[in-house]
Amino acid sequence: MIHGIGTDIVQIERVQRSLDRHGARFAARILAASERDGFAASRDPARFLAKRFAAKEAFGKALGTGVAIPATLHAVAVDHDERGKPLYCYGTALAGFLAERGLSAHLSLTDEVDYVVAFALIEKR
């Protein structure tokens, strides 16, 4: 059964302006610890951050909490499986919260020249 859906769109140039203005502090606000190496290695840091931010916003909307405890920006991370499919990873507290409620999340990400779009679906098992 579907618990919730969420979507978010982010303009990459807006993220670039924030990166230009605030540098590493801006990235640190958005990224979970597990995402920092990927960011450092990225050829397009603004696009990398835009994807993560959109995915986390979409997750919070699907969960119904917004980006707030337990679904903070640092508690949700984006990774990929061996075939490149995006997936969510969670900090310990959020993983427990989801497990207690029998919830699992799915993520779709797409990007074009100027925008990134994320769609999240959370289902109750």
Swiss-Prot record:
It is found in: Cytoplasm. One of its GO terms (biological process) is fatty acid biosynthetic process. GO terms for cellular component: cytoplasm. Its main location: cytoplasm. Mg(2+) binds at residues 8, 57. It catalyses: apo-[ACP] + CoA = holo-[ACP] + adenosine 3',5'-bisphosphate + H(+). Coiled coil: none annotated. Its cofactor is Mg(2+). Keywords: Cytoplasm, Fatty acid biosynthesis, Fatty acid metabolism, Lipid biosynthesis, Lipid metabolism, Magnesium, Metal-binding, Transferase. Its EC number is 2.7.8.7. Transfers the 4'-phosphopantetheine moiety from coenzyme A to a Ser of acyl-carrier-protein. NCBIfam families: acpS, pantethn_trn. Belongs to the P-Pant transferase superfamily. AcpS family. This is Holo-[acyl-carrier-protein] synthase. It comes from Aromatoleum aromaticum (strain DSM 19018 / LMG 30748 / EbN1). The lineage of its organism: Bacteria, Pseudomonadati, Pseudomonadota, Betaproteobacteria, Rhodocyclales. The gene is acpS.
